[in-house]
Amino acid sequence: MKCCPASILDRFNAIKVINVMGLRLNGRSVPWLLQTRKFINITSPRYTAGRPVILNENQLIRYLPNYTNKGDEEVTRRKKLHEPNGPKFHELPLNQNILDGLSTNFAEYKNSTPLQQRIINALMKSGVSFIVRGWNGSGKSFGAMLSTLSMYFEALKFLKHNPVAGKPVQSGCQVLFIVPNDNLAAQYQFWIERLLHGITEKEELQHIYKILTLTPASLDSFQNRPPYIGITTFPNLQHCIKKNQPILKQFTSQLQLLIVDESDLVIPDHGRSRRLSSPEILADKIFLSSFIQLCKKNLRINMDDENVGGMGIHSQLHGKGSIPTMVFMSASNSKNGVNYLSRYITDQLGIIGIDRKHQWYWNLTSTPSVFHYLIKAQAEPKTTKVTLTNLPYEFVRFNNSMHSIGDNNFSYNNSEAVLQIFAQSVPRILNIEAKKSKLENNILKCVMIVLPKEFNPHSFCNQYKGFAVGNRFWQCRTLSTESLNFSTNLNNVVFVANPSEIRGLHLPSITHIFHLWSTFSGVAYQHIAGRLGAMGQTGKIFNFIIPDYYKSNDFKKTDFRRCILFMLQRVGIRPKSYEFDDEHF
């Protein structure tokens, strides 16, 4: 999408975000910008509001009445034409230790994704704060983690040739990851330990990274032995700010790089009001601004060259100022977020993928190997039998009343009856999928159940211990940090979670998701469905609708099928018709 003409931008906002075609800012040349244009899109935001949903011609083909599977092949072909695989990791500016760890411990990842290429180059070369919008499973978190670990080993290399500079840990926490939940923090921990297995000693890991929790032991460890990379969650950091914990001054005064994962949950842009009704846990509205102000207050502006060089981070992060270099990553970032961040980042702000919001190869449709289904479940009167039927597809035109309904969540009248219907539906689909996997020579390993926020996953697992399907028993397990397993060898497990617990997670053993539809938020569905299809993997997501127990007054006045199809349409999804080959359906 093209930027708006410069004439409609006021001077104050225009200087905040550099236009990629311009080479001067306030009369000063920025020659380093020419070196970054290939991997980071630095452009001006569009200052408009209330834009309707835009569907280009490639998107519209998926909604035409005469749409066929041949159209899928065309979409896939054009996707590959526009966004091929990124370069191999050894072609990117990563430290050799990181490349060795990738080839040894992540052998399944041969090539980077186009988005990883942009993130790694921007972090390692430009030193510019930037905001990223990329499809789910595009490797945003993994690419950022590789870059920060590479910075650590570059610091060690510097110290080897400059022993007078001192140890890296003496300068405190240099990089801070902020994530929405403990599960995503555990995933970062798993990635780091797996990547560095056989490369660093186990004792050295505590100097490289630590997870900040609210326990006294964790706070003391951060205070006295700060790591190079800190990882914490929105709630934990928010609690530290409210309680004015002494540790805040310790690491904000040394912080050089701040990476906010799933940043749309903390940026109070205009889309936040729409997400307030979604099942995700949002951070406090002033959380981000409070933390940035804290960094401004505590960060040492006049850092001597020995300390900065000793960490080796100044060579990567050119921008030395009153706030650290900041990176914001999410599949739901928008230009409103760019406008908000421009209040604090007043020199240069890069954007990656923001202009591609409505491009079909930059969203959920970028993973054509993931199939979406919409199934209505109903209990027959006076019996316990459940009937499953496909909801027929139709193109839904834009309608303001449906738009408002689509942004409101709804709940159920009888949660116990709803769970009984849902618990009967899941094993029946599993039975069909197990038969198909044998015929197609695919292994059906693990699945995930996503319940509305009013349902408790622990209660579900206690009530339904598991599902017997054929000669296999699928054990129900909550998605807690104690039970998380990022191995690809896990089998016969049903992970049960709420939407707020799965943000950003990549569990490679999961191939199917069973989602009990409870919200019309396109943002929420995008992140639920995004748990599949990472790095080109295949998968299926089954959306179950149980309309007999909806209690929303708005929903009773409106065709629920059209509302749900409208929300799927907003994220570029056309559900397929599922083939029920079981006679009981």
Curated annotation (Swiss-Prot):
Record GO biological process: mitochondrial translation; mitochondrial translational initiation
Motif range (DEAD box): 261-264
Compartment(s) of residence: Mitochondrion
Domain Helicase ATP-binding: 121-351
S-S bridge residues: none
Known EC number: 3.6.4.13
A Pfam family of this chain: DEAD
UniProt keyword list: Activator, ATP-binding, Helicase, Hydrolase, Mitochondrion, Nucleotide-binding, Translation regulation
SMART domains membership: DEXDc
Keyword Ribonucleoprotein among UniProt keywords: no
Amino acids binding ATP: 134-141
UniProt GO MF annotations: ATP binding; ATP hydrolysis activity; nucleic acid binding; RNA helicase activity; translation regulator activity
InterPro entries in the record: DEAD/DEAH_box_helicase_dom (IPR011545), Helicase_ATP-bd (IPR014001), P-loop_NTPase (IPR027417)
Motif residue range(s): Q motif: 87-117
Record GO cellular component, one term: nucleolus
Catalytic activity from the UniProt record: ATP + H2O = ADP + phosphate + H(+)
Subunit organization: Component of the MRH5C complex, composed of mrh5, ppr4, mtf2, and sls1. Proteins mtf2 and sls1 form a subcomplex that serves as a scaffold to bring mrh5 and ppr4 together. The MRH5C complex associates with the small subunit of the mitochondrial ribosome.
UniProt record similarity statement: Belongs to the DEAD box helicase family.
Protein name, UniProt field: Mitochondrial translation ATP-dependent RNA helicase mrh5
Organism name: Schizosaccharomyces pombe (strain 972 / ATCC 24843) (Fission yeast)
Lineage: Eukaryota, Fungi, Dikarya, Ascomycota, Taphrinomycotina
